[in-house]
Amino acid sequence: MPRGSNEVIVIMWRDIPAQVNAQAGRERKQVQLSDKFQRAIDRAKRKAHIYTADEDIAQWRRISLPLVGDLAEAAQREADRLDSEYSRERLGRLAFAGGYEADVDNTAISADALLALEELEENE
């Protein structure tokens, strides 16, 4: 979809969601995802040996979805969907695989390594 259209945009680092934006014309709404997503991204960057800004910037992408209904509600609905769809274990596996969903099944991860991913839990 062209920028400036009515859409919900999911900002991704590789295959890990980072943020949800919605826009209708000039009106915009931004929803920050929970901290577990940022912690998974940080861990995936370390696993993938991404240390420079240039390397990091090349990994970001956006997914455009049609805007259905109210701007704020649509953004929050997508953020809630992502939060429920990406469990701590799924994010941990993604982080361990360097952020690529396609590599998750090919990456052997032990139960101990999964337990070490408790840092992805939110402290609420």
Show the residue positions of the predicted features.
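Short, charged/polar N-terminal "headpieces" of proteins
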Residues: 1-28
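Acidic, aromatic-enriched beta-alpha/helix-loop junctions
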Residues: 25-63
